[in-house]
């Protein structure tokens, strides 16, 4: 599981039948450098995330990927690579 930030919405012209009515968001996974403000998140990779929570742009989420991203739908199968598992209220970093 990773921390990511929602940076936009995804709109599809055609959609797989199992994703009808789903909200898809564009997210950027955050590294420690991003969380400390040392690096701009928009310089890195973007992911399309299945979002069941209507998360807004700028919010941070807990992101599951791969096989774990499809587990909330079991036994139904959905073509999902990334899933918003939680909206994060805050993230606190400790210096070590």
Model feature map: region roles:
Residues 18-27:
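Short aromatic-glycine-enriched beta-strand elements
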